[in-house]
């Protein structure tokens, strides 16, 4: 047989499109041609594969070899196709039975000795292989990650000779058995460690219950960062699909996806981060912080210290839950359904309104400082809370609400939302909002009058409605009442003061 086809997977964002590696041997002067839009690392695989085959004891065909990576319009990069190319050459030259490659996908980079090295982005490929009902061959170091795709048969190999012996029937391999030891609970910091700040804790409860974005404003040392770091522990546990989605993102980003499996991400980029670092980018697009925070929390401390153009790129993903990065050779889509928590000081020195009277900032300095945050960005933050200085006691607080107690209330509210509309309140579209956030006529007129008095936009009013819906869910009430609207409006009315 002079033609063989082996299936593999490319990496495009967090997707893994199928790539067919076609190997054809023809008569003529010995040569090896690789086509199908390969990048440098893929073109270099010709030399790696040749040395690996020879050092493993196989014959390298002295014929005219053509390798095609289809589809031709899909860019291919990295050494992930080495193993597929080697198996294709072996099958096309008759050193392996061609039928053994049916229903098989493989990933792996070859060393010159024939050893198989790990590659990144294995989990998205494993999920795609499972959907295609194929068996997956991966390097042994990637096997635990690939096994997260439940129902997929995985073969883990260290050397080219192992998979060749399996395909020839001389030394059959057993499917990899996942250890399952890396799914231990991750201890989140407890909310009870934060002393006082009842109003801020109430806002944190509302934010967790409805997946609302939150802005904490106050002097230094009042507990803004402590409060933000407690939010992931209040959120409901990830379900299997969400956990796999998060793990797939970290697999693509070269992070170990099992390190905190299956915990909600908490990302805290420095205020000097660039726009590509925040939303993703590069000649070969990689996920940024907003994608790494998918299904979790993105915490931006010292919000006005970020460059304004960096903050403005958050506006689209805050609405759509995804980010699209366009390049000359195509567009890459990354998920970005994160919960934004931001913290800021009220003025450049940080002590505006502090009882100590230490603030010496002029009104112009305060206005210029706050002017770094655009109105459209602030409108997309549902809850604006002032965190004021309280007790300075070094003794641990007693009687503080624990994370377990708050997370139980959050879980009950989220269950009501999922049963009613299939998503958290913050993610309601316009039609679903009108359907699930209906008001009595008197309450509707009251909210409209408040919006006119405070000069709120229609988007701000919609977000007030969603927060009010969350407040009603926390009380297990079906109808939104005036007091829910008043509290939701309070979080909005303190925005720009």
Locate predicted features:
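Walker A/P-loop
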Residues: 216-258, 320
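Basic, amphipathic alpha-helical bundle interface domains used for macromolecular binding and assembly
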Residues: 35-46, 61, 68-78, 285, ...
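Peripheral, non-AAA+ core regions of ATP-driven protein-machinery
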Residues: 1-215, 219-226, 326, 479-497
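P-loop NTPase nucleotide-binding/switch module
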Residues: 168-206, 210, 240-290
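The Walker A (P-loop) glycine that initiates the GxxxxGKT/S ATP-binding motif of P-loop NTPases
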Residues: 218, 280, 302
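Conserved catalytic network of the ASCE P-loop NTPase/AAA+ motor domain
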Residues: 26, 57-60, 97-99, 129-131, ...
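Residues immediately C-terminal
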Residues: 112, 298-299, 305-306, 392
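Walker B catalytic acidic pair
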Residues: 295, 301-302, 313
């Amino acid at each position: 047989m002079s033609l063989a086809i082996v299936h593999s997977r490319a990496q495009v964002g967090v997707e893994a499109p199928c790539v067919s590696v076609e190997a054809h041997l023809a008569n003529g002067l010995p040569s090896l041609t690789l086509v199908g839009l390969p990048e440098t690392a893929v073109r270099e695989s010709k030399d790696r594969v040749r040395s690996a085959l020879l050092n493993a004891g196989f014959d390298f065909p002295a014929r005219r070899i053509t390798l095609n990576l289809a589809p031709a319009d899909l860019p291919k990069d990295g050494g992930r196709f080495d193993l597929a190319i080697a198996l294709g050459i072996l099958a096309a030259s008759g050193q392996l039975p061609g039928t053994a490659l049916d229903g098989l996908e493989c990933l792996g980079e070859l060393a010159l000795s024939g050893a198989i090295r790990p590659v990144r982005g294995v989990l998205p490929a494993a999920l795609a292989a499972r959907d295609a009902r194929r068996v997956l061959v991966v390097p042994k170091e990637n096997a635990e990650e690939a096994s997260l795709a439940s129902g997929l048969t995985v073969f883990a190999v260290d050397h080219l000779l192992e998979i060749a012996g399996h395909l020839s029937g001389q030394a059959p391999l057993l499917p990899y058995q996942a250890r399952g030891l890396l799914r231990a609970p991750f201890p989140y910091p407890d909310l009870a460690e934060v002393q006082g700040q009842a109003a801020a804790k109430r806002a944190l409860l509302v934010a967790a219950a409805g997946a609302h974005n939150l802005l904490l404003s106050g002097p230094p040392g009042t507990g803004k960062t402590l409060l933000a770091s407690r939010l992931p522990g209040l959120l409901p546990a990830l379900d299997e699909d969400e956990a796999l989605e998060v793990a797939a993102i970290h697999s693509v980003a070269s992070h170990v996806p099992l390190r905190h499996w299956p915990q909600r991400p908490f990302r805290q980029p420095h205020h000097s981060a660039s726009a590509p670092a925040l939303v993703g980018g590069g000649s070969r697009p990689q996920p940024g912080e907003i994608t790494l925070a998918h299904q979790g929390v993105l915490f931006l401390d010292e919000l006005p210290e970020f460059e304004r153009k960096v903050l403005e790129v958050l506006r689209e993903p805050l609405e759509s839950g995804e980010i699209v990065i366009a390049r000359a050779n195509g567009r890459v889509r990354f998920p970005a359904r994160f919960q934004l928590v931001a913290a800021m000081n009220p003025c450049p020195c940080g002590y505006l309104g502090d009882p100590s009277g230490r603030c010496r900032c002029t009104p112009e300095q305060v206005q210029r400082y706050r002017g770094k945050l655009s109105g459209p960005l602030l409108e997309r933050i549902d809850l604006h809370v002032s965190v004021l200085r309280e007790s300075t006691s070094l003794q641990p607080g007693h009687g503080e609400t624990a994370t377990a107690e708050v997370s139980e209330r959050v879980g009950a509210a989220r269950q009501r939302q999922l049963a009613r509309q299939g998503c958290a309140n913050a993610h309601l579209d316009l039609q679903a909002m009108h359907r699930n956030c209906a008001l009595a006529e008197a309450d509707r007129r009251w909210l409209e009058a408040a919006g006119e008095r405070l000069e709120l936009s229609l988007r701000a009013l919609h977000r007030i409605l969603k927060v009010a819906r969350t407040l009603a869910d926390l009380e297990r009430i079906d109808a939104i009442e005036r007091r829910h609207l008043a509290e939701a409006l309070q979080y909005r009315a303190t925005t720009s003061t």
